[in-house]
Swiss-Prot record:
Start-end of Basic and acidic residues biased regions: 581-590, 1019-1030, 1038-1056, 1139-1149
Matches recorded under InterPro entries: DUF1720 (IPR013182), EF-hand-dom_pair (IPR011992), EF_hand_dom (IPR002048), EH_dom (IPR000261), WH2_dom (IPR003124)
Record-given protein name: Actin cytoskeleton-regulatory complex protein PAN1
Chief place where the protein resides: membrane
Species lineage: Eukaryota, Fungi, Dikarya, Ascomycota, Saccharomycotina
Species in which this protein is naturally found: Scheffersomyces stipitis (strain ATCC 58785 / CBS 6054 / NBRC 10063 / NRRL Y-11545) (Yeast)
């Protein structure tokens, strides 16, 4: 029979329920010892009758507990955990008391194993006192400190576990803390915060505990016939006496041990009123009377302290395994009884008032309690233990029918029944067969199915079956989603070997929601149907109620309730006839027993109480109405009708007022919208989205297509320029030194390795020597060049590094410009970008799409209003727009600061899209001009208008000529005519150059062209600037090196000359001192008359003007013209004069003179085809006369007469001026540079050409070694070197590839005044300045006389440049 107290018990193996001895009195017939061994206890099928404690009146149990041979009392009901076993006599074993009143829901924590959770629960129950639900901090700290962890670690564990921050731990929090302790003990790191899964499980567990309300005994006893007995506990209470009898019977058992047990008192049965929900069933002892109940006897007091543990049984027999029975339930009928079987089967549960004392019967503790959950009942050893929850309260009283079995299990499970006594077939084989890795034949599974036990397979799913089905589900649900897809389920069910129609029917029944996948409950239903089919049972057409999952049932009930409420309403529900469904513990309600009766009277009308009285109000439906009553009713109806009419009129008036009010509000809103539109039109903010998109597309095409390409091209040009510079220098060096191999740096290294190979040590030594030479040269002021190729390699290396650095600098400038363009792009894009919301709003509110007809009509009206107002504003502002355009054009032509300020002032007043476009362009132009201004760049149109300085320089030019010949003073009538063309022609050229540049306007095409022109201008500027700097560096370095070499050579030659020359040299320079003394006077006199111009130079001026007009074309827009004028134009340099006067000197003869003097050739070096000595390769050398004068001056003895004291000073002055003139001519490619400084006009430079003969005397002072015929020659030779300080310029270097004209001559003479002249002297004769052509003949005579000199030595190429010895050790900048 099914016992409601046994539904929490797991099945056990057949156990003996007691021991029968020979001397046991025979009351009711009882089964023998051997028969007892075969008893199977546990859950029975419903057809078995339940033996109950309460027997009928015709059957009175008569069991005597006074004799020794009485059956041992068995534990019934939920027991406390007590140690069992044999205890020594007289000594009580220590006990651990659990708090059985603690309510802990049966919830499984996934991160803790089931075994650990049981241990933690046991520890928690022993640590929590009664009446509490949580363990306090002190008790928890005592337990946690036993782990041996540090306090810091325990503090972290506590902070993680105490989720509610209450200072105490509920069971899930306590279990979490112990789990974290075990993790820390294993060496695993503690998490910084709880994983989300853990936290959710713990919080759900805590909520379940918090929501659970302890059951109140008064509520349980309410509305039951036992409520009146809740407070009675008299001496004649048979349950109390029975408890004492039980203890005495245990004490006087045949074991002779003292008291039977010290069990904690447990409430068993229904009499005591205490709930059985939280009790836990355990191994039970046999009931007091197995086959009969005896009358209560006098209790026997125990003679000694109760034993803490005791095993059932006695003597030398094998002790029984602990058997678990229900509370206060007699032994189950497990076989035929030799007594009154029919009477026992017909026993009904009743109430015996004398059995109340059984309420206090103590139960024992078995140490195998935890293992009991693993024991199986009957023949099934594979059943898993099911966690049990609180028992449902049963109605008590005299019940003629036996109690029905109640479902138990974890929350979310349904209708589980216990495994039948005989077991069910093939369940174990099914578990092994359906696992994923199992590959067993189907015949093995089908052979174990069926048989005699197939009748035990019920519709309901047993606990064991459910556990097996869940295990199979978890094995196949690898993704842990809680679902199994159709294809996976097909693989699982196909293992059964069933036919396809059967599997389709099973799937249809299981997949109730038709989702194509099964959850855990639906999978269990499908597996149970498969199991039934394998046992030969038919598949039902509809799912039976026992197999409907609780989740589906609850959902369906809720849906039915909702449908009923929606269909009939809540008020139409009959509460009196409604069925109150009994809710079980699986729903975890706070108090499931408190349903609270609600009377249906609350839905009745309050006036129903007076309905039965006499009616005082007449109605038209009454049959006994008089005439007066009818008249009265008519008046009342008229009054009601009038009231209704008045209400209707008021409603109509109110509606009209409200409608008019709404119309007024709408008109007001329309006027406000029009005002806003007018404001937008006046400010130019009403541009449509299409225009913004168009402008944004143009911006993207410029910034994402054109600008990146231009920048990449600029970078490429920079790299090409750097490489070209290096290659150009390499070509020049190779031209000067044909034997130099730039690819081989080891030509000068002497190898010490095998076969003369150069080793790494040799290279390091060579580098160290070269470095030492360079340092010594830097300290002593001497050159480190020893005639080897190392200097050439070093120069090439330095030039390569300079080219790279310049390329990097230019790239940085380009990057700055790129960043400024990016800023402009971002600023414009923020104003032009539109969002999806704006686009959708534009479709709706600008085109009237997707809105009501009235609103669409207003939108169209607003568009027409905006268009008309836009035209009016455009007409009104047309003149102002033109004026603003003109003003903006004028302001753009101003410097960058004024240009940048103009768009800001105009940006606040643009009103039309055209004005806005002009504003955006002005903003971009402003930012670009600011960036260019920071870089020192100004636009071409700005430079054209804002550059009025060159004409003033040309006008001021006649005031600064350093010298003028006295002979040409009479021919000075034409200077005003000659001065006027130079300022006019450059200006006209500039105007012509500006014509291709477009004027400033508001069109986007012009903006694009302007932007492209700016970028082109910037690129040209960078390229020319790089070339200029590179040429300057190269020339400066070459000049320094060669000057140092010349100083060394001069010193060496002076030493040799002093040792070799005779002391009888003739002082042929005596007459020249008078000439040199007279030169300053001529200079001073010429300075006083600046307007004088030579007549001879007139034709030369007219030929030079076109060249100089063509030259500035490439650099009219150069913003650096003013800046370059200062560094490049050394106004104090008297040497920069036009080179056209060099035509009076034969360069071939001068070259032959130098070669003969230095002994470069065996045929005396007078060849006309010496390419290595061309003047183009020596840009820093002066003319032939200058070289001869320097040579003669350097060979003169240091201290022979007093005159050489003036010669070094003059030579120093000349060399300084020469260095300055060379520095001004450092950029030969400036003629085609857009941004180079425009050259001055030719006439201003030609005017200073005549003073060539004025400084004839000072140069030939150093010519004593010349033979006797030499003295007249120096008087004629100096015209050329004299022009050096005032008008001579070095020969121009090779022009760049696209030379538009001759190299520009810096405007140095227009700067500071020339240096102060020496003391004045008598003016030279006129013939000295006019007879320039005879100079070549005199030089030829001089060269013919020099041919006889054999003392001159032939030098190498590195020593071919000489200079004054006064410049030794000085650094020229």
């Amino acid at each position: 029979m099914y016992n409601p107290y046994q539904q929490q018990q797991a099945g056990f193996a057949p156990q003996q329920t007691g021991f029968a001895y020979a001397n046991q009195p025979s009351q009711q017939p009882q089964q023998s010892q051997s028969q007892l061994a075969n008893q199977a206890t546990g859950f029975y099928q419903p057809q078995l009758q339940q033996q109950t404690l309460f027997a009928s009146s015709q059957f009175q149990p008569q069991t005597s507990f006074g004799t020794v041979a009485s059956i041992q009392p068995q534990q019934t009901g939920y027991i406390q955990t007590q140690p069992t076993g044999f205890a020594s006599q007289g000594i009580a074993a220590p006990t651990v008391v659990e708090n059985s009143s603690l309510k802990i829901p049966s919830i499984r924590l996934s991160f803790i194993t089931a075994e650990d959770q049981k241990k933690f629960e046991h520890l928690f129950r022993t640590a929590v006192p009664k009446g509490e639900q949580a363990i306090n901090g002190d008790s928890a700290s005592t337990i946690l400190l036993r782990s041996g962890l540090t306090p810091v670690t325990l503090a972290e564990i506590w902070s993680l576990s105490d989720t509610n921050k209450s200072g105490s731990l509920l069971f899930p929090e306590f279990a979490l803390s112990l789990h974290l302790c075990s993790m820390a003990k294993r060496g695993e790191p503690l998490p910084g915060y709880l994983p989300e899964k853990w936290a959710n499980e713990v919080k759900s567990f805590v909520d379940a505990i918090s929501f659970s309300v302890p059951e109140d005994p008064d509520k349980i006893l309410a509305n039951t016939p036992f409520a009146s007995f809740s407070g009675t506990n008299t001496q004649d209470d048979w349950l109390s006496n029975l408890n004492n009898q039980t203890n005495s019977a245990a004490a006087t058992s045949n074991f002779g041990a003292p008291g039977f047990t010290s069990f904690q008192p447990q409430a068993t049965g229904y009499g005591g009123g205490l709930p059985l929900a939280s009790q836990r069933t355990g191994p039970g002892l046999a009931s007091i009377g197995t086959t009969s109940f005896s009358a209560p006897t006098a209790p026997t007091a125990p003679t000694a302290a109760p034993l803490a543990s005791q095993r059932t049984g006695g003597g030398t027999l094998i002790p029984l395994q602990p058997q678990q029975t229900a509370g206060l339930i007699p032994a189950q009928k497990t076989g035929p009884l030799n007594g009154f079987p029919q009477q026992l089967q017909q026993q009904s549960t009743g109430y015996q008032p004398q059995l109340q004392q059984l309420q206090q019967q103590s139960t024992g503790y078995q140490p195998q309690l935890q293992q009991l959950q693993q024991q199986s009942t009957g023949y099934q050893s594979q059943l898993l233990a099911q966690r049990t929850g609180p028992l449902q309260s049963q109605s008590t009283g005299f019940q003629p029918a036996p109690l029905q079995s109640q479902p138990t299990g974890r929350p979310g499970e349904w209708g589980f029944v216990h495994t039948p006594t005989g077991g069910i077939p093939g369940l174990n084989a099914m578990q092994q067969h359906f696992l994923p890795n199992a590959d067993l034949p189907t015949n093995n599974l089908q052979n174990q199915m069926g048989g005699d036990l197939k009748s035990n397979v019920t519709w309901a799913i047993t606990k064991q079956e459910k556990s097996i089905y869940d295990g199979i589900f978890q094995a196949w649900d690898t993704t842990r989603r809680g679902y199994i897809d159709g294809d996976v389920a097909l693989n699982v069910f196909s293992k059964s070997g069933l036919s396809r129609p059967d599997l389709e029917s099973i799937w249809t029944l299981a997949d109730t929601s038709d989702r194509g996948k099964l959850n855990k409950d639906e999978f269990s239903v499908a597996m149970h149907l498969v199991y039934r089919r394998l046992n030969g049972l038919d598949i039902p057409l509809r799912l039976p109620p026992e197999l409907i999952p609780p989740s589906n049932k609850y959902l369906q009930d809720s849906m039915d309730t909702m449908k009923n409420s929606l269909r009939g309403g809540v008020n139409n529900k009959s509460y009196s006839g409604g069925k109150q469904t009994k809710s079980d513990g699986t729903r975890f309600k706070n108090d499931d027993d408190d349903f609270g009766y609600v009377s249906n009277a609350r839905h009745r009308r309050r006036s129903t109480a007076t309905d039965n009285g006499p009616k005082s109000i007449k109605s038209s439906s009454d049959s006994d109405l008089s005439v007066e009553d009818l008249k009265k009713l008519i008046r009342e109806k008229r009054i009601l009708i009038d009231a209704l009419d008045a209400e209707d009129q008021d409603a109509v008036l109110n509606k009209k007022k409200e409608s008019q009010h709404n119309i007024d509000i709408i008109e007001k809103l329309k006027s406000q919208i029009k005002d806003v539109q007018a404001s937008l039109n006046s400010k130019g903010l009403d541009a449509p989205i299409e225009e913004k998109k168009q402008l944004l597309g143009v911006l993207n095409s410029l910034t994402r297509d054109k600008v990146p390409n231009l920048i990449s091209n600029i970078y490429k040009v920079h790299n090409d320029i750097a490489k070209a510079k290096v290659e150009l220098l390499k070509a020049k060096l190779l031209k000067q030194n044909p034997s130099w191999n730039p690819d081989s740096n080891e030509s000068e290294i002497q190898g010490t390795g095998p076969n003369g190979e150069v080793t790494e040590l040799d290279r390091r030594k060579f580098q160290s020597k070269q470095l030492l030479k360079q340092r010594m040269a830097a300290l002593t002021g001497r050159t480190s060049n020893s005639g080897s190729n190392a200097d050439l390699d070093l120069q090439l290396k330095q030039e390569s590094e300079k080219a790279k650095s310049e390329s990097i600098n230019q790239s940085n400038i380009v990057k700055d410009i790129e960043s400024s363009i990016k800023e402009l792009e971002d600023g414009c894009a923020t104003h032009l970008q539109t969002s999806a919301t704006e686009e959708s709003g534009s479709e709706k509110w600008e085109r009237g799409q997707g809105i009501s007809a009235e609103v669409a009509a207003f939108v169209r009206e607003l568009n027409s209003f905006a268009e008309s107002q836009r035209r009016n504003i455009a007409a009104q502002n047309s003149s102002s727009l033109e004026s603003s355009t003109v003003s903006s054009t004028a302001e753009v032509s101003q410097p960058a600061s004024s240009v940048s300020s103009q768009p800001v002032s105009a940006s606040s007043s643009y009103r039309t899209p055209e004005e806005r476009a002009a504003y955006i362009k002005a903003q971009a132009e402003k930012k670009m001009n600011e960036r260019l201004a920071k870089l020192g760049i100004s636009r071409s149109r700005n430079a054209t208008i804002a550059e009025p300085n060159p004409p003033t320089k040309v006008d001021a030019q006649p005031a600064t000529p350093p010298v003028a010949p006295a002979v040409v003073e009479s021919a000075a009538v034409s200077p005003p005519v000659k001065k006027q063309p130079p300022p006019v022609s450059p200006r006209s050229v500039r105007v012509e150059q500006q014509k291709p540049a477009p004027p400033v306007d508001s069109s986007s095409d012009d903006d694009d062209e302007e932007y492209a022109a700016i970028l082109k201008q910037k690129q040209q500027l960078e390229a020319k600037e790089k070339e200029r700097k590179l040429a300057k560096q190269k020339q400066k370095q070459a000049r320094l090196d060669k000057i140092k070499k010349e100083m060394e050579e001069i010193k060496r030659r002076q030493a040799e000359a002093e040792a070799e020359e005779d002391s009888d040299e003739e002082p042929s320079s005596v007459p020249t001192y008078t000439v040199s003394n007279s030169a300053p006077k001529a200079v001073a006199k010429t300075a006083e008359d600046p307007v004088v111009e030579p007549v001879i130079a007139k034709s030369v001026e007219q030929e030079a003007v076109p060249d100089q007009v063509a030259a500035p074309k490439a650099h009219e827009s150069n913003p650096f013209s003013k800046v370059q004028a200062t560094p490049t134009g050394n106004s104090t340099n008297p040497f920069f004069k036009p080179t056209t006067k060099e035509s009076t000197i034969d360069p071939k003869k001068a070259a032959a003179q130098r070669a003969s003097q230095r002994g470069l050739s065996k045929n005396d070096g007078w060849s006309d085809s010496d390419d290595n000595e061309s003047e183009d390769d020596q840009p820093n050398r002066a003319g032939a006369a200058q070289l001869a004068s320097l040579l003669f001056g350097g060979m003169a003895p240091k201290s022979k007469e007093s005159t050489p004291q003036q010669t070094p000073q003059q030579e120093k002055t000349e060399s300084e001026a020469l260095s300055k003139s060379v520095s001004t001519l450092k950029d030969p490619s400036g003629s085609d540079d857009e941004f180079s400084t425009p050259p001055p006009d030719a006439p201003s430079q030609q005017t200073v050409a005549p003073p060539i003969p004025t400084e004839v005397p000072p140069i030939p002072t150093g010519a004593p070694p010349i033979p006797t015929g030499a003295p007249p020659i120096p008087t004629e030779a100096p015209p050329i070197p004299v022009g050096g300080p005032s008008s001579f310029a070095p020969p121009p270097p090779p022009p760049p590839p696209p030379p538009p004209g001759p190299p520009p001559i810096p405007n140095a003479p227009f700067g500071a005044p020339p240096p102060p002249p020496p003391p004045p002297g008598p003016p030279p004769p006129v013939s000295n300045g006019v007879t320039a052509p005879p100079v070549t003949a005199d030089i030829g005579a001089l060269l013919g006389q020099i041919q006889g000199g054999k003392s001159l030595k032939k030098v190498d190429a590195s020593q071919q440049k000489i200079s004054s010895n006064d410049l030794a050790g000085t650094v020229l900048s």
